[in-house]
Regions:
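Glycine-rich, flexible loop/turn motifs
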Residues: 31, 82, 143
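Structural recognition of the beta-strand scaffold that forms the well-ordered cores
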Residues: 34-36, 96-99, 126
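Substrate-binding/active-site groove segments that recognize
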Residues: 27-49, 65
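Long, amphipathic alpha-helical surface segments
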Residues: 2-21, 39-41, 56, 60-66, ...
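Short coil/turn segments at secondary-structure boundaries
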Residues: 25-31, 110-113
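Alpha-helical segment that forms one wall of the substrate-binding/catalytic cleft
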Residues: 50-82, 91-98, 103-109
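Surface-exposed patches in mature extracellular/periplasmic domains of secreted proteins
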Residues: 23-26, 79-90, 130
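Residues that flank catalytic or metal-binding motifs in active/ligand-binding sites
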Residues: 11, 29-31, 93
Length: 157
């Protein structure tokens, strides 16, 4: 075991690739105002009142991404239970959980009870199976298959 430090830069690059990056205000699939790397505009954001299509600077996009990433990283640890247990996971598994949390939010991630249980038991085969046994898996397409592949690669080591 021992503490494994998550590769933050790699994790952020993977999420950015999966979320995409848009330098303007756009509507997500549910019609919510979004900007940058999947940042859901909040009423307290200055951009909340902006028209869809308004350009947003790279600096602003990066700032929200920093905040959102940190928030979801902390949420992932909270959902998982303890920082120590989270840090004892193989590094790629840590990235998968943070990526899922960024995509789903902590509340929805916490509903993946069987997947989290398998993860806590370091049962990667079962974790991969449980990922697939969800509506999310079909909804996000290539992203879920890629994340599942990372989990399955942990089996083979």
């Amino acid at each position: 075991g021992g503490i494994r430090i998550m590769n933050i830069e790699l994790c952020k690059a993977e999420i950015k690739r999966h979320e995409g990056e848009v330098l303007k205000i756009y509507e997500d699939s549910l019609g919510y105002k979004t900007l940058g790397i999947g940042h859901l505009c909040q009423p307290e954001d200055p951009e909340y009142s902006w028209e869809v299509g308004t350009k947003v600077s790279q600096e602003v996009v990066d700032m929200y991404y920093e905040q959102d990433f940190e928030k979801h990283y902390q949420e992932t640890i909270h959902v998982f239970g303890s920082e120590e247990d989270f840090e004892n996971l193989p590094e790629p598994i840590q990235r998968v959980l943070v990526n899922m949390c960024f995509n789903l939010g902590g509340t929805r991630l916490s509903k993946f009870k069987n997947m989290l249980k398998a993860c806590k038991e370091h049962n990667w085969d079962e974790m991969a199976r449980q990922m697939e046994d969800s509506r999310w898996f079909g909804q996000v397409g290539r992203r879920s298959i890629e994340l599942q592949k990372i989990v399955l690669e942990c089996c083979s080591t």
